Regions:
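Flavin (primarily FAD) cofactor-binding/catalytic cores of flavoenzymes
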Residues: 1-45, 88-246, 252, 256-456, ...
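N-terminal glycine-rich dinucleotide-binding loop that anchors FAD/FMN and/or NAD(P) in oxidoreductases
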Residues: 48-73, 236-252, 316
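Dinucleotide-binding Rossmann-like beta1-alpha1 core, especially the glycine-rich loop
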Residues: 51-67, 71, 81-105, 109-111
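Glycine-rich, highly charged phosphate/nucleotide-binding loops
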Residues: 76-77
């Protein structure tokens, strides 16, 4: 049997999960190569952090590589030295919220396990892909790899500096990318800090500053001034909406539906989080039922509210935010930046508050936490620039990532499918909508794995149970 090769470009969680699913479902005769410059896989933006203040945002029992593995990581983590060394991971309701690096290491361990036990030949090439033409992937070191199928598992480009801050680029008080290792080490304990953005990245930053005993005033601002909600404490049965009834085809209609469902749940003494969780589980189907115009309306009007309710934070982190707000150390504003200048080591920001008033800030550090620049994804590395420049791939109409079809195949500039070039993970969310949370990313990786095996006409075996241990 001739060897066939699938090349996965990007070895964060998405690419590593895809490789594991291929190893589980594939058979002898298949080579899977993950191109990722980091020494270990599954160490992307989310799970590559080494800061112990950064915790998984949901209980460990909900972290898995496949839907039928609920509780496996939780079991393994509780038996690990990491759990014994981190008593704060155990919340009072009995759930555990590990440091995020623990999950990344666990996923990497699964990859290593399948390298040793799967009939599929798995390999990790520590390099970066810079071009893909005529079925050949070229790497930064000059290697050329023949690929029958290529998957782009490139999810999170670096943050983009807001236009008003670009003249300050390079100023020691401007922290443009808080994801960089030791980026916050330069914040002195008494520094006054401004944080632009109030989502998950901001929550990580505040938790990190708290861990390093920062005591200066922190001003957090975003246009709507909304913080991520805390995750649900306790154990509840799933709440299920009735999808058998006629469904709305508009963003406004779904907003009304969700509000009604939340009221009904409250009448049963059930928390609103259960309603949002069911919407999330069915989010891809709902998203694809909306027209492009309605999807655009959702992103413009409702996305900020969806994000703070959908992407919730660990209770340990929520507790830090609440305590700092109560003490007056942290102040949250609904505002936008209208001017910025430097005066030596001091940075002066002018904000426009939601009511129209101006507000001046003088700080020592400005930290940008507006998240990945997904609208600039195709310009974020050499490979994507080449593919885009050649007309092989194009951005999706919503500027969320890369345009794909229902099979996750990329579409060229003429709207035609590239049968040998796929996207896995969040970069495909323009098509699928709900594709940022780990359960959905893992499910998408499993779906793409089966698409790849079917496209290569390879037999697909029933997924073998993994040895899901460290």
């Amino acid at each position: 049997m001739s060897q066939q090769q699938i090349v996965i470009i990007g070895g964060g969680f998405t690419g590593t999960a895809l490789a594991i699913h291929l190893a589980r479902a594939g058979q002898a005769g298949l080579q899977v190569t993950v191109i990722e410059p980091r020494a270990q896989l599954a160490q992307g933006v989310a799970y590559g952090t080494t800061d112990p203040a950064h915790r998984i945002n949901v209980p460990a029992g909900r972290m898995q590589l496949a839907g039928d593995e609920k509780g496996v990581f939780d079991r393994d983590y509780r038996a690990s030295p990491g759990f014994r060394a981190d008593p704060e991971a155990l919340w009072h309701d009995g759930n555990v919220y590990p440091q995020r690096g623990e999950f990344g290491r666990w996923v990497n361990a699964q990859f290593v396990h399948y390298q040793q036990h799967s009939p599929v030949k798995l390999s990790h090439l520590r390099d970066s892909a810079v071009a893909f033409k005529n079925g050949v992937v070229t790497t930064a070191s000059g290697q050329q790899i023949h690929a029958d199928q290529v998957v782009l598992a490139i999810s999170h480009p670096p943050p983009d500096l807001p236009a008003l801050l670009r003249p300050l680029k390079g100023h020691p008080g401007l922290i443009a990318n808080p994801w960089q290792r030791d980026a916050l080490a330069q914040v002195a304990p008494d520094d006054r800090v401004a944080i632009i953005g109030s989502g998950l990245t901001m929550s990580d930053v505040v938790a990190s500053l708290h861990r390093q005993q920062h005591r200066g005033k922190i001003t957090v601002f975003s246009r709507r001034g909304q913080l991520p909600r805390a995750n649900l404490s306790g154990s509840f049965e799933n709440y299920t909406l009735d999808y058998g009834q006629p469904q709305s085809s508009t963003a406004r209609g779904w907003l009304h539906r969700v509000r009604q469902e939340v009221k009904q749940a409250a009448a049963l003494n059930l928390p609103w989080q259960l309603v949002l969780d069911d919407i999330r589980r069915n989010g891809q189907r709902i998203w694809q039922s909306l027209s492009l115009h309605e999807q655009q309306r959702f992103l413009h009007h409702l996305r900020p509210w969806w994000d703070v309710h959908r992407y919730r934070i660990a209770p340990q982190v929520s507790q830090v935010l609440s305590q700092q707000q109560a003490s007056g150390q942290l102040n949250l504003l609904a505002a936008r930046l209208i001017a910025a200048e430097s005066d030596g080591a001091t940075l002066r920001l002018t904000l426009r508050l939601r009511g129209g008033q101006s507000h001046m800030l003088e700080v020592k550090k400005v930290i940008v936490t507006t998240g990945p620049a997904h609208n600039a994804l195709l310009n974020s590395n050499a490979l994507l620039r080449q593919l885009h420049g050649d007309g092989v791939i194009q951005p999706d109409p919503l500027a969320l990532g890369i345009e794909v079809n229902a099979l996750s195949q990329t579409l060229n500039v003429n709207g035609e499918a590239n049968p040998g070039l796929y996207v896995a993970g969040p970069a495909a969310r323009g098509r699928f909508g709900e594709l940022m949370g780990l359960p959905q990313v893992a499910e998408h990786a499993e779906s793409v794995a089966r698409q790849l095996l079917n496209a290569l006409s390879l037999p697909v075996s029933e997924r073998c149970p993994g040895s899901l241990t460290y």
